[in-house]
């Protein structure tokens, strides 16, 4: 796998609803490998690769990332904001962001009342969004001209490899899934299924792109490629880990939005066991992904989510494992190349 592609993907800005830069890069990357490529009204990028059968496989990975949106520009030049997608405000304090303006990205820093003028009661409380602001360092007039209400901002942290095959970056949710799906399209040769590789939009705000994309494809089965929170850290007990970093691709049995098709789950487990693909079973009481929309399309689609273990999810220091990425790729590629019978 070419991890320079993942590095480039994580460096792009693509808050939900503003995925155009990510989509353009993926389209350029995959156009030479596609039999057909199109973009729909919702902004989903649909890459089609003809198979040797008349059966259709839908593979999806969402382009968007969590981020911020300016909802107030003060007369002092400081910006107030809301979160786009689920972000814990505790992770935002003292972080850098890049505001996406029509004249290019603008650096900002998230601040709050400084510690030396807060009370003991203030310091005992968790900082909420209303206590945070973005400081661009620019004159008020320039801020008001460049950064109107509705401007989005992404967390600002570079891709870095560290430790034993680990990667940390912002937006690994879900540029990691996009990377795996893009590498799959580049690797496919004479797949059994007609493969629809769909790079969806607005997953982080309600699986919206997947709803319309799935409706336009008569899929026989589907896989969603996405990240999931790995809680294998000192603050959590083993029963709450959900999934562990470095132990393989997650096959999702159940989450808040989807119960994985039992026959498909069994087939995926068998593929892993027969092909030395490391896997884990994921059962989560919270969270979901595009599978939640896809499996309800039309009269229903056999669907399962492949989940990539990710520490610090929805932050600017998300962590994934190269090993897990390789296992997700191997499983998804095998599914595309060979018929699954039920």
Show where each model-derived region lies.
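N-terminal hydrophobic/helix-forming segments and targeting peptides
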Residues: 1-342
